[in-house]
Design a protein with these regions (language model features):
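C-terminal outer-membrane beta-barrel translocator/porin domains of Gram-negative envelope proteins
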Residues: 144-277, 282-286, 290-292, 332-334, ...
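Transmembrane beta-barrel strands of outer-membrane/channel proteins
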Residues: 8, 22-28, 89-95, 134-142, ...
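Repeated loop/turn-to-beta-strand initiation elements of outer-membrane beta-barrel proteins
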Residues: 16-22, 83-89, 126-132, 170-175, ...
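Extracellular loop and loop/strand-boundary signature of outer-membrane beta-barrel proteins
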Residues: 29-32, 36-40, 50, 59-64, ...
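Outer-membrane beta-barrel "beta-signal"
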Residues: 310-317, 337-350
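Outer-membrane beta-barrel initiation region
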Residues: 1-90, 126
Length: 350
């Protein structure tokens, strides 16, 4: 069974005539509605009554209650450039409802996340081949989760961020590096727990190298390190589309310390302005995580996977189809035998 996602996005160049840009996107999934009219709250029970486990006539041995799934993702970003500075404002919101089973019944969980960010980047130095920039930013994250109508968590994080970014020409390719430091702050209503005042370091390296006119190699690695026990939202997550292939539905891992390495070879079969660009590709990725103060078997893990796919792009259309296979992984991870990834986008310009 697959999960189909659909959405739309809008890019507006220079809406104020000052070289700025506005971006908005919305994404959702095929929703699975389920009748929950049989459910009751504990407050509505009379003395001696117990909560029902299903609708009238339900048998937990023979019957299966329907799963509920809803997901809505909203994202907004505004950027403005002035000389060597770039100001970025961002806002996003996600609303997710899913279900989990127990031996006798089913429960629905709802999570809501609202994020706001502001970033300022300055180009420190550049020439025809290289560029170095410094960025500072502030993020506010508000996460709520419920099981049925019971509040499970309500957390606000405020995060300060400073990063150093560089790109240069290296052995006929383009090499990029980003060093990043994040710190949880007591500001803007943030939680005052020790976990909310974390420190985290990240390093991203990427390399793009045309080996011939048609053969291209891409390399990307992302590693993060923290001595603190992080909230799940701040851990580095590995597995699935855009990460280690083969673990999108099952087998995602996350950790306070993590590394992910991605390699890809692509070959341009067609490269035409009229017809478009067609490129088959093959990729291999590896990822590993470790969680602080967690000595159990689930405290660390690793995954590796490969994919083979085909990309097609033209002026108004992008298509990507890939077959993904999980390779080696930690013993407790149970991925699917294979996964198929498909995405397409229609571009309309005014």
């Amino acid at each position: 069974n697959g999960i189909w996602r659909g959405g739309t996005s809008i890019n507006i160049d220079s809406p104020l005539g000052i070289g700025d840009r506005v971006y908005f996107s919305y994404m959702t999934v095929h929703k699975k509605k389920a009748d929950r009219s049989w459910k009751r709250t504990t407050e509505s029970l009379k003395p001696g009554e117990i909560l029902p486990i299903g609708p009238k006539g339900y048998d937990p041995v023979k019957d299966t209650l329907p799963y509920k799934r809803e997901l809505d993702l909203y994202n907004f970003r505004y950027t403005m450039k002035f000389r060597d500075y770039t100001l970025s404002l961002g806002s996003s919101r996600s609303e997710n409802i899913s279900s989990f089973y127990t031996p006798t019944t089913i429960y629905d969980m709802e999570t809501m996340s609202s994020n706001f960010s502001v970033n300022l980047d300055k180009i420190l130095w550049r020439n025809q081949k290289s560029k170095l920039s410094l960025g500072v930013g502030l993020k506010r994250k508000h996460n709520k989760s419920y099981i049925e109508d019971t509040l499970l968590s309500d957390r606000i994080l405020t995060i300060g961020d400073i990063s150093l970014n560089g790109t240069t020409v290296f052995y006929g390719g383009i090499f990029g590096i980003t060093l990043d430091y994040e710190r949880g702050l007591r500001a803007l209503g943030a939680s005052n727990t020790p976990k909310a005042e974390f420190k985290k370091y990240s390093l991203n390296l990427n390399y793009y190298k045309p080996l011939t006119k048609k053969l291209v190699y891409r390399f990307n690695t992302l590693t993060s390190h923290s001595k603190d026990v992080l909230y799940a939202s701040e851990k580095q997550s590995i597995g699935g589309v855009g990460s280690v292939p083969g673990y999108h539905r099952r087998g995602n891992i996350m950790g306070d310390r993590a590394i992910e390495i991605e390699n890809e070879l692509s070959y341009k079969i067609i490269d035409s302005e009229k017809i478009g660009r067609l490129s088959p590709y093959i990729s291999y990725s590896y990822g590993a995580v470790r969680n602080n103060k967690n000595p159990s078997v689930y405290g660390k893990g690793y995954v590796s996977g490969a994919s083979i796919g085909l990309r097609y792009s033209m002026k108004y259309l992008d298509v990507d189809l890939a077959y993904a296979k999980a390779l080696s992984h930690s013993s407790y991870i149970k991925p699917r035998d294979r996964e198929i990834y498909f995405s397409t986008s229609l571009k309309i310009r005014f």
